[in-house]
């Protein structure tokens, strides 16, 4: 199968949702010091009728414009929870992170939808992390906060994704029940040779530590990135230097080879 990026039409997304075109790949997240695998991030791929795989850029913008984002997110989360349940039954208790758009979190039925997916799959809420992109959080956050708080009370972790790319980071960290701060790759990859990026990176890690939440560095792509993450005290890392996104069976093989 080949991986290409070309935008789908609304009709193609509707048809694909009905035909189960969603294929999830999972990128490992590992402990920065031991490199032990602790979880994965679920990432969207879309399979066309001819077997071509499309990335999220071909699907998500159209889904957001056409009002299909909630249906797409529901399908992704349901698929990810079924996979999490399978891994748990096989003895692998990896945390699974799923991305959510702000429009998802303003839906009145979002908590029920997530509850249903957890109940049907039997996946444990404590192994689920909801990732919310910081730059997309709205000014009126009351409904989003309500949804996240309710899911946090059920045991799910809450991650602020792409930290450092928005404009109201401190206020959001103060108000939302975040358990994880995910530092944007723009401040991680190559930061060892860019003083301004390194300063932002270091401050973000320190902020997470002071708030008592986990820090995650994404975009770790070489040994220098890894060394910097370790020197700054980052908790978890993710990136091509560790592993590329993989289909579920490959994740298990990768973990076994590494003694996990």
Feature names for model-found ranges:
Residues 1-2, 32, 36, 49, ...:
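EAL-family c-di-GMP phosphodiesterase catalytic domain
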Residues 2-62, 99, 160, 238, ...:
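Active-site core of bacterial EAL-family cyclic-dinucleotide phosphodiesterase domains
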Residues 34-41, 66-143, 219:
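Catalytic core of bacterial c-di-GMP phosphodiesterases, primarily the EAL and HD-GYP domains
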Residues 42, 59, 76, 80, ...:
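Hydrophobic side chains in well-ordered alpha-helices of soluble proteins
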Residues 60-61, 70, 149, 198:
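Conserved long alpha-helical elements within nucleotide-processing catalytic cores of c-di-GMP signaling
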Residues 114-117, 146-154:
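Catalytic-core regions built around general acid/base machinery
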């Amino acid at each position: 199968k080949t991986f290409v990026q070309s935008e789908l039409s609304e009709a193609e997304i509707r048809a694909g949702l009905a035909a189960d075109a969603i294929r999830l790949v999972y990128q490992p997240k590992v402990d920065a010091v031991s490199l032990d695998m602790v979880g994965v991030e679920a990432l969207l791929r879309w399979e066309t009728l001819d077997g071509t795989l499309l990335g999220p850029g071909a699907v998500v913008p159209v889904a957001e414009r056409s009002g299909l984002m909630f249906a797409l997110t529901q399908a992704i989360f349901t698929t990810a929870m079924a996979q999490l349940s399978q891994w748990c039954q096989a003895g692998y208790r990896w945390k699974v992170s799923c991305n959510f758009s702000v429009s998802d979190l303003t839906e009145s039925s979002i908590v029920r939808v997530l509850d249903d997916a957890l109940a049907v799959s039997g996946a444990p809420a404590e192994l689920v992390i909801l990732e919310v992109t910081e730059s997309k959080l709205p000014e009126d956050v009351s409904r989003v906060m309500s949804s996240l708080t309710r899911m946090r009370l059920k045991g799910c972790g809450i991650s602020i994704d792409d930290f450092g790319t928005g404009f109201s980071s401190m206020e959001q960290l103060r108000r939302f029940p975040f358990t994880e701060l995910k530092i944007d790759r723009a401040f991680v990859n190559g930061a060892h040779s860019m003083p301004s990026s390194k300063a932002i990176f270091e401050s973000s890690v320190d902020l997470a530590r002071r708030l008592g939440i986990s820090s995650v560095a994404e975009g770790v792509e070489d040994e220098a990135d890894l060394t910097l993450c370790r020197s700054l005290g980052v908790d978890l890392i993710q990136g091509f230097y560790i592993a590329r996104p993989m289909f579920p069976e490959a994740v298990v093989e990768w973990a076994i080879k590494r003694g996990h």
